[in-house]
């Protein structure tokens, strides 16, 4: 009898899982080089993104909102960060700016992009119930969970790959299951739309796109 009960329970859970997965589609963005499972076809809109150091960058928001909750992916392109910072620094010098006001801080803006993206979650009017490091296909990032005042829960993840910052977010109603399928489905694509598989941890700050100079050898004091 116990074996039958366990089998029945397992069957019910399997059916529930299948039912929950129904309606999800694997969405691919060749423009922003990612793929993720959304609960329906997402709407896409352009939006400005203000970097930590005050540079306005282009971004796309892919979103679906239905009875399951609100699911979104925000992608910010940091490609022109160096150019924009250089132009701002030149204007500052021309205007006779003083001290550090005219520094070109583009490398810091890029290196701090994940932390800045994570801060957009942390500063909300919500209780942080989890915060930690994680990887998506060996691309490191930050992962967090929030409990909102209305009892809903927000699950967020922030990664950087190539020149783009990715902010994955799902908010589900009070009592709803965690959006595991959505969270675990993120993949990064190459220029030909193929899924990228790394053999070791990817480092966004030393990727081919940025070509940051290698640090000089350390010196003993």
Positions of the model-derived regions?
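Conserved polar/disulfide-associated segments of primarily extracytoplasmic proteins
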Residues: 48-157, 221
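Short N-terminal segments immediately surrounding and downstream of signal-peptide cleavage
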Residues: 22-41
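Positively charged n-region of N-terminal signal peptides that target proteins for export
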Residues: 1-4
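Short, solvent-exposed coil/turn segments at beta-strand boundaries
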Residues: 37-41, 66-68, 138-139, 159-166
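Sec/Tat signal peptide C-region and signal peptidase I cleavage site
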Residues: 17-21
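Surface-exposed amphipathic alpha-helical segments
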Residues: 30, 42, 91-97, 101, ...
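N-terminal leader/targeting segments
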Residues: 41, 46-47
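Bacterial N-terminal signal peptides
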Residues: 7-16
């Amino acid at each position: 009898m116990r074996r039958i009960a366990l089998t029945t329970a397992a069957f019910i859970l399997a059916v529930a899982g299948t039912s929950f997965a129904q309606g999800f589609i694997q969405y691919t963005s060749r423009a922003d080089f990612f793929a993720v499972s959304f609960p329906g076809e997402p709407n896409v809109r352009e939006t400005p993104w203000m970097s930590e150091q005050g540079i306005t960058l282009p971004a796309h928001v892919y979103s679906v909102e239905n009875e399951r909750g609100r699911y979104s992916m925000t992608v910010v392109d940091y490609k022109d960060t160096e150019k924009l910072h250089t132009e701002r620094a030149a204007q500052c010098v021309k205007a006779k700016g003083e001290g550090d006001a005219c520094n070109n801080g583009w490398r810091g803006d890029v290196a701090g992009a994940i932390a800045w993206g994570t801060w957009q979650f942390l500063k909300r009017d919500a209780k942080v119930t989890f915060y930690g490091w994680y990887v998506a296909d060996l691309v490191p990032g930050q992962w967090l969970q929030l409990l909102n005042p209305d009892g809903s829960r927000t699950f967020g993840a922030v990664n950087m790959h190539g020149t783009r910052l990715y902010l994955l977010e799902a908010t589900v109603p009070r009592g709803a299951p965690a959006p595991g399928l959505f969270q675990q489905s993120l993949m990064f694509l190459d220029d030909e739309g193929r899924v990228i598989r790394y053999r070791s941890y990817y480092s966004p700050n030393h990727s081919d796109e940025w070509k940051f100079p290698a640090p000089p050898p350390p010196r003993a004091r």
